[in-house]
Swiss-Prot record:
Catalytic activity: 3-methylbut-2-enoyl-CoA + hydrogencarbonate + ATP = 3-methyl-(2E)-glutaconyl-CoA + ADP + phosphate + H(+)
Ranges where the Biotinyl-binding domain occurs: 643-715
Disorder association: 3-methylcrotonoyl-CoA carboxylase 1 deficiency: An autosomal recessive disorder of leucine catabolism. The phenotype is variable, ranging from neonatal onset with severe neurological involvement to asymptomatic adults. There is a characteristic organic aciduria with massive excretion of 3-hydroxyisovaleric acid and 3-methylcrotonylglycine, usually in combination with a severe secondary carnitine deficiency.
Residue positions of the active site: R339
Biological source species: Homo sapiens
Subcellular location: Mitochondrion matrix
UniProt enzyme class: ligase
Impact upon substituting E383K: In MCC1D; uncertain significance
Domain Biotin carboxylation: 48-494
Pathway noted in the entry: Amino-acid degradation; L-leucine degradation; (S)-3-hydroxy-3-methylglutaryl-CoA from 3-isovaleryl-CoA: step 2/3
Membrane spanning stretches: none
Descriptive protein name: Methylcrotonoyl-CoA carboxylase subunit alpha, mitochondrial
PANTHER family named in the record: CARBOXYLASE:PYRUVATE/ACETYL-COA/PROPIONYL-COA CARBOXYLASE, METHYLCROTONOYL-COA CARBOXYLASE SUBUNIT ALPHA, MITOCHONDRIAL-RELATED
Length: 725
């Protein structure tokens, strides 16, 4: 009992409350009906699985729970203090608190998770993606405690998780590998010498790495030491192991991976390949299956090589064998991820399978559900990862509330895998992914068209997202042609990050109309509440007897103020003059569900857009795209709210100061590293914006800095003094 009291228990048994919240998720319709019953699976050792603990959070925890419920298996969630009100907690049958927000004290605490499994009487643990999913010690601990680990045996995690070991095993199994150094000597000098031997550019990679963490490209010996130290710090934080390997970096390769499954009976199959070449910060952003332009004979060779890799380590469960492929479709083994991948839904869409169900059945001792001959490839699928990040600021992750969230309608060919709802917070403590948008169609072009259509219907207000960037990417001619590689985003950076275009005058008219109609709706509500229809505050129509009323309105498009003269016509329409052009505007607001729509006609051209007005910004979402128009703050208010930046760099986001390189009195050059922040599982180096002398450092190592707060102050230079005078 004492052990059980170490974790606080939240029994999520309120069926009414849980199902009240689920419809807003827009999850794909299911053919099963959940009833209060359980299903038993018997493992090879005779153990039953009636309850599974998901040792993860967010969308992957919700994904696993849906399949478990389909099979009648009860689900147990774990959560940190930051996730107390999260979606995966609400979906679970039981949920247990396991500590503070930092992952090291919660989701990476093996002892706490094992204790929850015992307390809840869960027979199995599904690790999801990330966290402990590829941790050999955790898999071994589950085995010692008699708990079924839904994943490969600890030996396979060890052999494939240590990249130096995996390369040797793959070479022995006849799988081609990339030239590199995978030795035990981890001294900086040894690694530098091997980098010189291999020849620049090289890739520094964490031995236990994954997800782009602890990975750096080094193009010259001069930058080797700084990049090595940065990779070590990030690897230590993410995997508690800073051992590194060095590999030859192949310019503009393709990243092609193969989904494999093994079982306890010695069987192994492949479920075709996925192309994950388009990446930023060495992390995938859009994936597709099958890989474009791959001929059937190459596809077969890839699959067979992946199966050889799995069999070489007696693999059990879901795994992904990753390859580097050149322009001639020659491929080399890169690594094997011993878990279910984030992008697994695209494989499910083209094969008609449920890979989480396969995981559960195989963990229970069953054979792989289909033979290799029975696994067929149908159609084409894309997955777009929707992140809370700012593409224009080097894809810097952001945190904050999802003030408004609406998604495309889910159907059998459109899936939305998410772990958040409207009103939820994207936390600074975890990965900033909001959702995965997955679409399927009969061929690649049709799937791509569906992807872009669905992205336009994915509307988020409250923080920066990469949705517009994904639209630009998926519409790029080279992407449409299937000419993808890992340097795609850097190569086409200018085209993908187009400068913000000035809004069309017709769009400004729409925004002005939306604001006017919202004001009128608020006035009408006031009238109803005040019960005084003769109050002078009860009308916003602008109508006057015998005269026309004209209102001067100012909106802000980007950095430009736009003057709009709005004349209220007697028939309820509006004449809007912008510069020397006049537009006849008519429209109304209506609601669908929780959303407000603006139906509008500008000079006879009808349109429909979702309208959101939040604080001082008007948001319009339509099939043509989205626009944001600001309502300028009066000068007497803006002067009160303005802040001084104190001449130094600001924190790009909320995070922890990991390393401080400077102190008061130090002279620095523009571009010098000042400090390192850790935020949202990524390391960010703060560089000096100018030459100068450090006057004050506001944070020490280990301190928490809030977004947009000054980090370093510089001494005022003589030129600055003269300008201020």
């Amino acid at each position: 009992m004492a052990a059980a009291s170490a974790v606080s228990v939240l029994l999520v048994a309120a069926e009414r409350n849980r199902w009240h919240r689920l419809p807003s998720l827009l999850l794909p319709p299911r053919t099963w009906v959940w009833r209060q019953r359980t299903m038993k699976y018997t493992t090879a050792t005779g153990r039953n699985i009636t309850k599974v603990l998901i040792a993860n959070r967010g969308e992957i925890a919700c994904r696993v729970m849906r399949t478990a419920k389909k099979l009648g298996v009860q689900t147990v969630a774990v959560y940190s203090e930051a996730d107390r009100n999260s979606m995966h907690v609400d979906m679970a049958d039981e949920a247990y608190s396991i500590g503070p927000a930092p992952s090291q004290q919660s989701y990476l605490s093996m002892e706490k998770i094992i204790q929850v499994a015992k307390t809840s009487a869960a027979q199995a643990i599904h690790p999801g993606c990330g966290f402990l999913s590829e941790n050999m010690e955790f898999a071994e601990l589950c085995k010692q405690e008699g708990i079924i680990f839904i994943g490969p045996p600890p030996s396979a995690i060890r052999d494939m998780g240590i990249k130096s070991t995996s390369k040797s095993i793959m070479a022995a199994a006849g799988v081609p590998v990339v030239e590199g150094y995978h030795g035990e000597d981890q001294s900086d000098q040894c690694l530098k010498e091997h980098a010189r031997r291999i020849g620049y550019p090289v890739m520094i990679k964490a031995v236990r790495g994954g997800g782009g963490k602890g990975m750096r490209i080094v193009r010259s010996e001069q930058e080797f030491q700084e990049q090595l130290e940065s990779a070590r710090r990030e690897a230590k934080k993410s995997f508690n192991d800073d051992a590194m390997l060095i590999e030859k970096f192949v310019d503009t390769p393709r990243h092609v991976e193969v989904q494999v499954f093994g079982d306890h009976h010695g069987n192994a199959v492949y479920l075709f390949e996925r192309d994950c070449s388009v990446q930023r910060r060495h992390q995938k952003i859009i994936e597709e299956a099958p890989a474009p332009g791959i001929k059937s004979e190459v596809r077969k060779k890839l699959g067979e090589a992946a199966v050889r890799a799995a069999k070489a380590v007696n693999y059990v469960g879901a795994g992904t064998v990753e390859f580097i492929m050149d322009s001639k479709h020659n491929f080399c083994f890169m690594e094997m991820n011993t878990r279910l991948q984030v992008e697994h839904p695209v494989t499910e869409m083209i094969t008609g399978t449920d890979l989480v169900e396969w995981q559960l059945r195989i963990a229970a001792g069953e054979k792989i559900p289909l033979s290799q001959e029975e696994i067929t490839l149908q159609g084409h699928a894309f997955e777009a990862r929707i992140y809370a990040e700012d593409p224009s600021n080097n894809f810097m992750p952001v945190a904050g509330p999802l003030v408004h969230l609406s998604t495309p309608r889910a159907d059998p060919s459109t899936r939305i895998e998410t772990g958040v709802r409207q009103g939820d917070e994207v936390s600074v403590h975890y990965d900033p992914m909001i959702a995965k948008l997955v679409v399927w169609a009969a061929d690649r072009q049709a799937a791509l068209t569906k992807l872009r259509y669905s992205l336009r219907q994915y509307n988020i207000v409250g923080l920066h997202t990469n949705i517009d960037f994904l639209l630009n990417l998926s519409g790029h001619p080279e992407f449409e042609a299937g000419n993808v590689h890992t340097d795609f985003i850097p190569q086409h950076h200018k085209q993908l990050l187009l400068s913000r275009k000035a809004a069309a005058k017709e769009s400004l008219c729409q925004a002005a109309l939306g604001l006017i109609l919202k004001e009128k709706a608020m006035t009408d509500t006031f009238t109803l509440q005040a019960h005084d229809q003769f109050s002078p505050f009860s009308s916003s129509s602008g109508r006057r007897l015998n005269i026309s009323y004209t209102r001067n309105m100012t909106l802000k498009d980007g950095k430009n103020n736009v003057a709009i003269a709005v004349t209220y016509n007697h028939d309820g329409s509006y004449s809007m003059q912008i510069e020397d052009k006049t537009f006849q505007v008519l429209g109304n607001l209506y609601s669908e569900g929780d959303c407000t729509y603006l139906k509008c006609s500008v000079n006879g051209v009808a349109s429909k857009a979702k309208l959101i007005i939040l604080e001082n910004t008007i948001y319009l979402f339509s099939k043509e795209g989205s626009i944001e128009i600001d309502i300028p703050v009066p000068k007497y208010l803006s002067s009160v709210s303005s802040q001084e930046t104190q001449g130094g760099p600001l924190a790009p986001m909320t995070g922890t100061i990991e390393k401080v390189f400077v102190k008061a009195g130090d002279k620095v050059k523009a571009g010098d590293s000042l400090m390192v922040m850790i935020a949202m599982k990524m390391e960010h180096t703060i560089k000096s914006p100018k030459d100068g002398t450090v006057k004050k450092v506001f944070y020490r190592e280990g301190a928490q800095a809030n977004r947009h707060t000054p980090l370093v102050e510089f001494e005022e230079e003589e030129s600055d003094k003269r300008e201020s005078e």
